[in-house]
Amino acid sequence: YGMKQKGFSLIELLVVVAIIGILAAVGIVAYNGYTNAAKRNTTISNHNTVKKFYQLMVTSCAGGIVEKFELKRSSTAKEIVYCPLNAHANINSLEYHFMYEGFANAYGTTPRLVIKGCYETAWQKKNNHGCVSLTAPDDKTLKLTTYYLDQDKNSQSLTDTVTIE
């Protein structure tokens, strides 16, 4: 009888394992790059959404289009924000509204997307990427600051100011 070999040799199995390892390593690097880009793009989009939302409120009040806004205060309760707007008073309202609208920090570093002063310390600037920080230098000015990581994982920031007319 001639014996027929069934199965693979050790060398063949090692080659297959090596190929799978190389593909996995390449895939992980590509996946990390993709997720980092998605976090960065989502963070920039979130910053712009908060800015445009407040700009719309300011413009609507200034133009006499509306006298008040209904913002979410919880999953079931609404908060009425009246014109004229006050930047100091509106920060808390915006925090809750965006939280209950389902907006989240893409980096997961803070419990909410919009937070008053989430970059006040050096530690926060280094670790709270993705948070849209709202501050009010005065009653007529709302300042938005957001930190994110660029493609080289360096910290970058966006800063915008909305002025109440």
Language-model features: locations:
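Broad hydrophobic/π-residue packing in well-ordered secondary structure
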Residues: 8, 31, 57-60, 142
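General helical secondary-structure elements
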Residues: 2, 35-36, 47, 108
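Periplasmic/extracellular, small/polar-rich flexible segments of pilin-like filament-forming proteins
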Residues: 59-165
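Short, low-complexity cationic-aromatic patches
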Residues: 24-30, 53, 80, 133
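Membrane-proximal N-terminal amphipathic helix
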Residues: 36-65
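Short, contiguous, well-ordered secondary-structure segments
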Residues: 1-2, 56
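N-terminal single-pass transmembrane signal-anchor helix
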Residues: 4-35
